[in-house]
């Protein structure tokens, strides 16, 4: 998340081209030509001993002779000289460098050198970067691009060149165009942090092949996507494609889960990528998902309608008033409906009247206008009419509009007009619908992430017991545990299993069956055969002693024939579960090499292919995220919504997934968990067969997770001055109702001191931003008092760190009727300790001069107090390093 050096890279004031040349085919010539042609305002310093000047600019023989230190250096020489040149740049004090090419064998040495000099690197094997707002073309691309609001980050030079060429033809603009190359140092997460705060960037498009740090990516993407739409195209979905790209990018469903968790939207192919660029460049934000379609032909509208239906889109319903106005304005033969077919003889006036009426209504959230080539209604004339109406109408600048002028040659001028007017335009009805549904899905993802999770009921977790059982098994040399051994671990987290007994032979199996009652199930117990069904190692509905004996002997015989070297540790004996009307599910936890643990949900009784048969999520899960996973499974037909007798208990299954998530988060020794089948019968969920793979784990248990979990270790009981005890803990997404109630008990004066303005009401979005935090980026502690089965919030303090983890902005607020109990000071002391322990250097805040209580508290805690009377504020700064020394 570091931003060190990015300003010098993306907004350099001076540039040195190392290896500048006058030979047209050389990289140094191409880079100089593009820098000068791009209109860069600062000094460009060619460095070459071969020429006294390059393209009319005085050259310098070596790096040491440069008259001053450049902000940015670009290595255009033979890769064999990279390390020596990087050393010279570091000695000169240069802080950023673009490396255009370097073999993999150099990577480690280059990175060590750069870190020694605190230099940032883009590349190697980077096409470079373009920043049109700075007049900067520090790339090989001769294609000039316009200034725009879309930033593009790519890990592929080929894709970068393709997009540049495509954008030039459409006169599409960018705020930044960055080719990462091998991402040896600067990576996509840092650029997302930078672009999220960049005023020239309103949307971001990513082309990704791999990640070096999944957790940093998810954290940065989630933060940026709260303010700006981000679309991702990820190649390497198949193992063959990963081999071709020479990447180990992890499971494709894991990417889907991470992209969704971060609030991004994934596009699947190059066609969708081009549509996405058009959409992000021009489309206005959506207010909802209701689409109105206008067309001058039934067939194109039908194609759009089919695509909308296949993607589960929603048509707008016109009100009676709107329908009446349209009937009065349009010819009688036109059927007033949605889609609205104006027929192939639709004139300019028909389009204008229709648009005027629709723009004045509140019946839709987005408007799609289709035009097919027609002699009676020329496309260019209709395009002019649409653009003029949108500009003239009072609501024109607020409507989300998509245009689809079909055809190629006859529609070129119309599409050019739309691009000039800043209106999104597409070549096909299906492509237009795809673009619309991209934004609908993005909006849904964002809304889903901001929903307040319900508090799960009766969640059980005995982490200490589970740890002890796992450590004991590992100490005994176990690497895999079966159902019988896993039972107490699952029970520690409230997960139900069938009682299971171990039988060494057929006689013992008969004895156990007689004790527990018939019918029973027998299952092979072997560490070498994880899938018992492969050797017919499961026998069900055994109703007599004779059946049990025969089944046991048959299992042993089949294993000896099919797998003679397998170790057989006897049989598992279970009472036969009542499967009548029940649904069999499967819950699996796998470890992905990029994203860590994944939770998968699918149907039981099938061969397991996660890419096709499961929905996937990243832990940790809360009830909201778990419910979303279940609903996605139903929508994608990965699980059924009901069995023969009962509807699926979505809440109950969501709670079970939360329990599985808690187990995985708390117990890093678990490498893989397979619950199959999980029997769902009405509101009961029972694990019939479970396999658990385990291994010793040494290190930070949170480091293996792509999303930082709730930090339980920061909880602390505190006694206030009046003797009451309250719990200091990190804030939770589930705290939103309690936070709203807390704010209602704070006076307007205290709220004014906190927020510097009068706030009548906090929206759900406001409260979601306060409670649904990324613990890697910010921390909020709440003081809560427990009353029976509920909690009330007494005070809140929070700190939001910058991406470099140097400074944090803090704030504190205590319930107005609880002042004088020392609560504010204790909360601040906890926040100071937390920020200091996490390596931050300074804690900063502001308040008002008449907030004397806060100013006095800050002084007591060691803050430097800077009263700025002209600004009407008081600056508060705490040097955490000095605080640590004291």
Language-model features, listed with the residues they occupy:
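A structural signal for short, well-ordered beta-strand segments
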Residues: 73, 675-677, 690-692, 810, ...
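Long, contiguous binding/interaction regions
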Residues: 698-886
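Short beta-strand element of the conserved SAM-dependent methyltransferase core
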Residues: 522, 573, 692, 783, ...
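Catalytic-core regions of core metabolic enzymes
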Residues: 1-689, 697
């Amino acid at each position: 998340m570091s931003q060190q050096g990015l300003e010098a890279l993306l907004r350099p004031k001076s540039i040195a081209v190392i290896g500048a040349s006058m030979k047209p085919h050389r990289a140094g010539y191409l880079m100089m030509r593009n820098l000068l042609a791009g209109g860069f305002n600062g000094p460009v310093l060619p460095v070459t001993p071969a020429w006294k000047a390059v393209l009319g600019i005085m050259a310098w023989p070596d790096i040491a002779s440069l008259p001053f230190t450049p902000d940015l250096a670009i290595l255009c020489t033979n890769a064999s000289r990279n390390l020596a040149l990087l050393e010279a740049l570091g000695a000169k004090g240069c802080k950023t460098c673009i490396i255009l090419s370097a073999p993999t064998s150099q990577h480690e040495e280059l990175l060590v050198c750069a870190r020694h000099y605190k230099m940032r690197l883009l590349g190697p094997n980077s096409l470079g970067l373009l920043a049109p707002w700075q007049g900067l073309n520090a790339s090989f691309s001769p294609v000039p691009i316009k200034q725009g609001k879309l930033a593009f980050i790519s890990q592929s030079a080929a894709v970068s060149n393709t997009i540049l060429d495509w954008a030039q033809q459409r006169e599409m603009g960018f705020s930044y165009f960055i080719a990462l190359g091998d991402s040896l140092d600067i990576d996509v997460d840092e650029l997302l942090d930078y672009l999220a705060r960049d005023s020239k960037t309103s949307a971001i498009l990513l082309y990704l092949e791999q990640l070096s740090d999944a957790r940093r990516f998810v954290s940065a993407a989630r933060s940026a996507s709260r303010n700006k739409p981000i679309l991702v195209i990820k190649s390497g979905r198949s193992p063959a494609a990963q081999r071709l790209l020479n990447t180990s990018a992890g499971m494709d469903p894991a990417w889907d889960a991470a992209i969704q968790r971060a609030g991004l939207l994934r596009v699947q192919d190059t066609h969708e990528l081009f549509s996405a660029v058009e959409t992000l460049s021009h489309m206005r934000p959506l207010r909802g998902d209701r689409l109105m379609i206008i067309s001058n032909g039934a067939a194109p509208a039908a194609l759009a309608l089919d695509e909308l239906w296949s993607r589960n889109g929603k048509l707008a319903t016109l009100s009676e008033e709107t329908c009446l106005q349209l009937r009065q304005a349009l010819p009688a033969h036109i059927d007033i409906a949605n889609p609205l077919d104006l027929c192939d003889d639709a004139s300019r006036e028909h389009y204008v009247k229709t648009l005027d009426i629709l723009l004045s209504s509140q019946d839709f959230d987005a408007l799609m206008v289709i035009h097919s080539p027609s002699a009676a209604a020329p496309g260019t004339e209709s395009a002019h009419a649409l653009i003029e109406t949108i500009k003239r109408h009072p609501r024109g600048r607020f409507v989300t509009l998509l245009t689809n002028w079909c055809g190629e040659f006859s529609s070129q001028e119309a599409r050019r007009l739309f691009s000039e007017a800043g209106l999104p335009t597409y070549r096909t009805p299906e492509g237009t619908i795809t673009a619309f549904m991209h934004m609908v899905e993005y909006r849904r993802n964002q809304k889903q992430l901001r929903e307040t999770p319900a508090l799960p009921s009766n969640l059980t977790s005995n982490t200490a017991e589970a740890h002890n059982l796992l450590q004991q098994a590992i100490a005994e040399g176990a690497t895999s545990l079966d159902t019988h051994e896993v039972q107490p671990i699952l029970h520690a987290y409230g997960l139900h299993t069938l009682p299971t007994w171990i039988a060494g032979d057929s006689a013992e199996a008969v004895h156990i069956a007689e004790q527990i009652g018939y019918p029973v199930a027998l299952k092979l117990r072997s560490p070498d055969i994880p899938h018992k069904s492969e050797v017919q190692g499961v026998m069900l509905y055994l109703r007599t002693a004779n059946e049990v004996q025969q089944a046991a002997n048959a299992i042993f015989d089949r294993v000896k024939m099919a797998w003679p070297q397998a170790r057989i540790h006897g049989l598992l004996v279970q009472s036969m579960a009542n499967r009548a009307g029940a649904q069999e599910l499967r819950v699996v936890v796998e470890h992905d090499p990029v994203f860590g643990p994944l939770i998968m949900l699918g149907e039981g009784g099938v061969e397991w292919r996660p890419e096709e048969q499961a929905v996937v999520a990243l832990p940790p899960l809360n009830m909201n995220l778990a419910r979303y996973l279940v609903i996605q499974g139903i929508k994608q037909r990965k699980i059924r919504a009901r069995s023969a007798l009962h509807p699926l208990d979505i809440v109950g299954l969501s709670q079970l997934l939360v329990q599985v998530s808690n187990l995985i988060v708390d117990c890093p020794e678990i490498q893989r968990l397979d619950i199959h089948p999980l029997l769902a019968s009405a509101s009961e969920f029972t694990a019939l067969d479970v396999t658990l793979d385990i291994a010793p784990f040494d290190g930070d248990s949170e480091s293996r997770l792509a999303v930082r979990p709730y930090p339980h270790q920061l909880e602390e009981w505190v006694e206030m001055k009046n003797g009451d005890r309250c719990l200091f803990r990190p804030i939770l997404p589930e705290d939103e109702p309690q936070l709203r109630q807390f704010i209602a008990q704070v006076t307007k004066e205290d709220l004014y001191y906190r927020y510097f303005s009068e706030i009548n009401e906090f929206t759900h979005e406001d409260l979601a931003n306060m409670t649904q935090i990324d613990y890697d980026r910010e921390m909020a502690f709440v003081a809560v008092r427990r009353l029976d089965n509920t909690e009330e919030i007494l005070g809140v303090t929070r700190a939001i760190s910058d991406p470099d983890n140097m400074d944090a902005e803090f704030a504190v607020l205590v319930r107005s009727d609880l002042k004088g109990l020392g609560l504010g000071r204790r909360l601040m002391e906890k926040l100071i300790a937390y920020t200091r322990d996490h390596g931050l250097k300074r804690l900063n805040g502001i308040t008002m001069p008449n907030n004397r209580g806060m100013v006095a508290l800050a002084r007591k805690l060691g803050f430097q107090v800077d009263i700025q009377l002209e600004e009407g504020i008081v600056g508060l700064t705490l040097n955490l390093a000095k605080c640590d020394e004291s």
